[in-house]
C-alpha cells in the first residue's frame, strides 16, 4: 500500500475521478435536503455562519490584546473577556451543529413532526442571533449563555477547536 507521500511523488498520469453527488436518501439524490419545503433554512444557516465568522474575528483580536502578544499591548482589564467570548463562540458553534442536523429537513420533507422540526430550526437560529447580539457588547450579559450551556451542552470540547 502506497503512502500519501509516495502518491504525491508519483507522476500525475493517473486516472482522474470526479465524484458525483449521491445520497443514501430518497432516490439517491438530495431532494430531501434541497427542496422548497426546507429552502428557508439555508439563508438562516449562512447568516449564522456570518455571525460566527465575525465573532471569531473579534475574538482573535481581543485574545491577542489580552495575551499581551499583539502589538505590545499589556495585560490588563480585558484579560477575562477572551474567555467569555470563547464561551459565546463555543455555544454558537453547538447551536449551529444542532441546526445543521439533517433530521430536521427529513422530518419536514416527510411531514413527520414537521412543526417540531421547524421549531427546532427556528430555536437554534434565534439562539445564535441572541448569543451574537450579547457577545458583541462591551459587557455582555451571560444569563442566556449559561442557560444554553446547560440545555444544549453537546460536545463540551468544542471550544477547544475554536
Regions found by a protein language model. Give the residues of each.
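Active-site and substrate-binding clefts of carbohydrate-active enzymes
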Residues: 1-68, 72, 76-162
Amino acid at each position: 500500500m502506497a503512502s500519501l507521500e509516495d502518491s504525491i511523488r508519483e507522476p500525475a498520469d493517473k486516472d482522474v475521478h470526479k465524484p458525483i453527488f449521491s445520497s443514501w436518501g430518497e432516490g439517491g439524490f438530495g431532494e430531501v435536503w434541497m427542496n422548497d419545503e426546507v429552502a428557508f433554512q439555508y439563508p438562516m444557516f449562512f447568516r449564522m455562519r456570518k455571525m460566527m465568522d465575525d465573532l471569531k474575528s473579534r475574538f482573535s483580536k481581543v485574545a491577542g490584546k489580552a495575551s499581551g502578544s499583539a502589538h505590545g499591548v499589556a495585560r490588563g482589564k480585558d484579560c477575562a473577556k477572551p474567555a467569555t467570548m470563547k464561551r459565546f463562540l463555543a455555544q454558537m458553534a453547538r447551536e449551529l451543529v444542532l441546526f445543521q442536523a439533517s433530521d430536521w429537513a427529513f422530518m419536514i420533507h416527510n411531514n413527520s413532526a414537521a412543526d417540531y422540526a421547524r421549531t427546532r430550526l427556528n430555536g437554534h437560529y434565534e439562539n445564535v442571533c441572541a448569543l451574537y447580539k450579547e457577545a458583541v457588547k462591551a459587557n455582555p450579559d451571560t444569563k442566556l449563555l449559561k442557560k444554553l450551556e446547560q440545555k444544549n451542552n453537546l460536545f463540551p470540547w468544542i471550544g477547544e477547536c475554536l
